[in-house]
Amino acid sequence: MSFDIAKYPTLALVDSTQELRLLPKESLPKLCDELRRYLLDSVSRSSGHFASGLGTVELTVALHYVYNTPFDQLIWDVGHQAYPHKILTGRRDKIGTIRQKGGLHPFPWRGESEYDVLSVGHSSTSISAGIGIAVAAEKEGKDRRTVCVIGDGAITAGMAFEAMNHAGDIRPDMLVILNDNEMSISENVGALNNHLAQLLSGKLYSSLREGGKKVFSGVPPIKELLKRTEEHIKGMVVPGTLFEELGFNYIGPVDGHDVMGLISTLKNMRDLKGPQFLHIMTKKGRGYEPAEKDPITFHAVPKFDPSSGCLPKSSGGLPGYSKIFGDWLCETAAKDSKLMAITPAMREGSGMVEFSRKFPDRYFDVAIAEQHAVTFAAGLAIGGYKPVVAIYSTFLQRAYDQVIHDVAIQKLPVMFAIDRAGIVGADGQTHQGAFDLSYLRCIPDMVIMTPSDENECRQMLLTGYHYNDGPTAVRYPRGNAQGVALTPLEKLPIGKGLVKRHGEKLAILNFGTLMPEAAKVAEALNATLVDMRFVKPLDDTLILEMAAQHDALVTLEENAIMGGAGSGVNEVLMAHRKPVPVLNIGLPDFFIPQGTQEEARAELGLDAAGIEAKIKAWLA
């Protein structure tokens, strides 16, 4: 998509923040309007995260107008809202390539631009990193400002509060901006509150505030009276007591779509000392009515026609694995009142919408709090219930200690339904589910299952749900199922694989949903094909049998080779002193960039042609 100068005449003048700061302030509302329209035009043609960026246009313009970026350092949390930032920082003409192979990264990325101070993708990291960056800037002595932008979802995570607690203790010079994009502008946002925010953020108020503290510090009753008076005055118009108690000077809430007001407030706050907190209210999906009405649906979008006001409907093909899980969850809950389902803010993505509506008293969305989700599940299990934690592979990493300390050591029957396992695609390095088999396999008493299709996935979910001797995990990929027939639910024998095809000389031991590719390769090479099903416990007997009957073995998985299922097979063979050659095929030792799942598998040699080529080269 080429940039249309006639359509966006003001935006055409801005290809860097230096050019932005040369614009007269009066032209900035027009720039915001063009930037929002350009974002709509670009993302609707290319796909990507959408509603969040529409809500941060004015904030982004104001930040880059007031602060001397990239010298001053701007940190975006998660990064869904950073598309306008990318457009204003030299990447305007490439925004149509975002999330595509070889295109712009879906999130702020240090290797892509000097304006991207912190590489992100997971939530709630900005304030912690910002404190470190602010401390480094102070020691550097170059008067460099630090600003963190965090959303109302990300700030609910414990890590954000840990960071703010630390900031209140060491008091670095930094600004945290809370982008609060609830469904409506707060009743406190208006002319009076914006005017008050500018007064409270000014140097005069700050000087009087700090000077008063020093003068009356030796007179405890008066000091306490002043504190209470200030809190009372602020409390009449702002909800900032919590952040004040953490040691921040709180300002807000203010209208996040008033670019001129934001500029005034930011200029006032730019030179204040110590940790500052600015609370802004924005509208997710701002400027595009369908996204304003349904920001969840328009959070991330495929290519669509903006004039239609709706996203393209599914082709009605095969259900996704998330839907398979959601259907199983509802079916099981209808039979067993002990089932409790937990998700860390991933209801839609994990296929739990129907469950949340049918069983609201047994559905728990704990927000972006993976650690809490796991230990909460442990408590439910102790109380005699049957918790199912639905979580993406990449986010389960954030609760690793809780899986070990709070669940596995106590042998609690918590089942982890691990979605987005393996290659995820367009969200790139931060979201690939590359490591779960490796980091779970080493945990004692953990049962790990890898279904080869949707029917086996259902059976494994049932098996894990009814396993009472410790935690279980069923991992399945992003994307559509394979269209196999669904059979009645029945428990599988723990730790037992299944031979799918008998061949000669070579045996392929497959773990998971690469089975269709493995079947093609087995047919081409006349190899034995085994659906291993369990990563832990491994079917040692079957592995040794395959080793005895074949000249070589190949393991296949969509997980990191290091420490994965193939490593487990190697360990079994070494423990029994079996000198059979083994080729481990899986994800290589680097972080996999964005692109479609098909592109990534082809490039990594995990499609049928690539797997066959790897095996032939190894056997040659």
UniProtKB/Swiss-Prot annotation:
Give me the residues that bind Mg(2+), please.
D152, N181
- PROSITE patterns recorded: TRANSKETOLASE_1 (PS00801), TRANSKETOLASE_2 (PS00802)
Q: Which cofactor does it need?
A: Mg(2+); thiamine diphosphate
| Subunit | Homodimer.
Q: In which pathway does it act?
A: Metabolic intermediate biosynthesis; 1-deoxy-D-xylulose 5-phosphate biosynthesis; 1-deoxy-D-xylulose 5-phosphate from D-glyceraldehyde 3-phosphate and pyruvate: step 1/1
Task: Provide the gene name from the record.
Answer: dxs
Cofactor binding, note field? Binds 1 Mg(2+) ion per subunit.
Report what the protein is called. 1-deoxy-D-xylulose-5-phosphate synthase
User: Organism, per UniProt?
Assistant: Salmonella heidelberg (strain SL476)
